[in-house]
Amino acid sequence: MASHEEILADKAIFAYLHRMIGDEGIELIRRFPTDKEYSDEELAEVTKINLNSVRNTLYTLYEHRLAKYRRIKNNETGWLTYLWELELDNMYDSVSKDLEIILEKLRKRYKYESENAFYNCPNCGNTITFSDAMDSQFVCQECENKMVHFDNDLLVNALQKRIARIEENLGHV
């Protein structure tokens, strides 16, 4: 099991986590004690990070299976306490899951871009499909300029390359 600092030293993992939880979340991971489970209040005190930021970070990490909690009930008050610990060993599963979601979106976009012809307004930049351009008689509905054909081959090729790269990283090839 890698330490929190070793995991954060990986630039790709750091960028992934930073996008997910921001600066304070990264600091929480850096300062998160590994000796036992901690309540969110204890973590805020130990790490000197705002309690709301600690909670938001923990919930986000939990959603990605990068943190887990154990719930205990105080029999006298009936209050529940959540004891948290990090599960950063699940990092690569989390990244893979998110990449699968991105891959599906890119595939849909690729299909849309490759199956349609587009027209663009040189004045305002509005872009529409051939079908919509025909319906509007190739006149921009925003500024009433004439629409011109827009060659999206560059975008289609870029999407194709990105999809291939992600598929290769995920072992789909």
Swiss-Prot record:
The keyword Amino-acid biosynthesis does not apply. The keyword DNA-binding applies. InterPro entries: TF_E_archaea, TFE, TFIIE/TFIIEa_HTH, TFIIE_asu, TFIIEa/SarR/Rpc3_HTH_dom, WH-like_DNA-bd_sf, WH_DNA-bd_sf. Keywords: DNA-binding, Transcription, Transcription regulation. Signal peptide: none annotated. GO terms for biological process: regulation of DNA-templated transcription; transcription initiation at RNA polymerase II promoter. Transcription factor that plays a role in the activation of archaeal genes transcribed by RNA polymerase. Facilitates transcription initiation by enhancing TATA-box recognition by TATA-box-binding protein (Tbp), and transcription factor B (Tfb) and RNA polymerase recruitment. Not absolutely required for transcription in vitro, but particularly important in cases where Tbp or Tfb function is not optimal. It dynamically alters the nucleic acid-binding properties of RNA polymerases by stabilizing the initiation complex and destabilizing elongation complexes. Monomer. Interaction with RNA polymerase subunits RpoF and RpoE is necessary for Tfe stimulatory transcription activity. Able to interact with Tbp and RNA polymerase in the absence of DNA promoter. Interacts both with the preinitiation and elongation complexes. This is Transcription factor E.
